[in-house]
Amino acid sequence: MNIKETNPSGGCHVVILGAGASIAATIRDPEIHGLQLPSMNNLPDVIGLHGCLNHFPAELIQDNFEATYSNIAEHDPGNPYLKVMNDLIYSYFDSMELPLKPTIYDYLIMSLRDKDVIATFNWDPFLYQAWWRNALHGSSPQLLFLHGNVAVGYNQEHNLIGRAGMYSKDRSIYFEPTKLLYPVKHKNYASDSYIRKAWDILQNRLDKDTCNTHNVTIFGYSAPVSDVEAMGLMKKAWGSVDDRNLEQFEIIDIRTEEEVTYSWRDFIHTHHYDYRKSFFESSLALYPRRSDEAFFCHFLPLTPEEAFVESNPVPQDFQTFEEMWEWYQPLIDKESQK
């Protein structure tokens, strides 16, 4: 029995993305303008912030931009060069575009359904661009931008998101660009209405009392000790690991298994985790659009066929969107037959 033969069910899959996911999405085919995706260690070099940083005391400047920014924001929050840096960062990320070929983000969008959620800490527009260009092909997952995003706008009055700086089709609703939550040491996730809403939804999906989430995938997010508030909010929703014996925690990361399991030790129930170094080794790529069904076949099978269900790995070498959409279409068709 192949997983694609199972009847679609409704359990939620939560995917949480960090910078490593966006980097992975542009390895095979780089960003269309040749722009480099910066990390917190090289962001001043890539974006060109040293002219601004030179206006601050040398003792505030650290190797990691997150530490530098936190020091500056605490030392001199009203300094005009802080706003200049904010504007330069926003402008750089806003100019980035995915290549015009299927990327890992396109696979990710197509491998989930509208019952699922992708939450990202990234500022770059790649995830939203992938969602937008695949939106007409099957139901798509809900997107949550936990630190804001250059591509996403929000209308608070109507509680709707759309493309930043754009209007709805009837031009009655304007989507105000979301604010980027810059890397201060103590982030206030309640300070912005959109970011607060995104966190509320994520916490709801992680809470076993409010949602039937069986699969959580962490992709390229290092669980930094500096982001105490983020980890605290997720841990509060997840609860005690002793109570999460029916969930599977999956980590896609190039770090060692020992490193990543230690980082996420407060979320992993004993052996209930999978460690992968590539997206294509993950449940998302092995059981696209059917990861929840695969979970039940493996852990709570009703028949011998379910216990030995075969995977349906998505091909890794699509060169056109048409090829990719054609491959996913039988899975989408079966969903409409429920």
Task: Put a short name on every predicted segment.
Residues 122, 147-150, 253-255, 290:
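Residues at the C-termini of beta-strands that transition into short coil/loop
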Residues 110-117, 133-139, 209-212, 220:
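Secondary-structure boundary elements
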Residues 24-26, 127-130, 153-156, 226-227:
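Short helix/loop capping segments that flank catalytic or ligand/cofactor-binding pockets
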Residues 1-17, 21-25, 204-338:
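SIR2/sirtuin-family catalytic core signature
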Residues 1-127, 146, 327, 337:
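Gly/serine-rich nucleotide phosphate-binding loop at the start of the catalytic core
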Residues 28-40, 133-136, 161, 231-235, ...:
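Short secondary-structure boundary/capping segments
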Residues 70, 75-99, 130-208:
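Active-site gating loop/helix substructures
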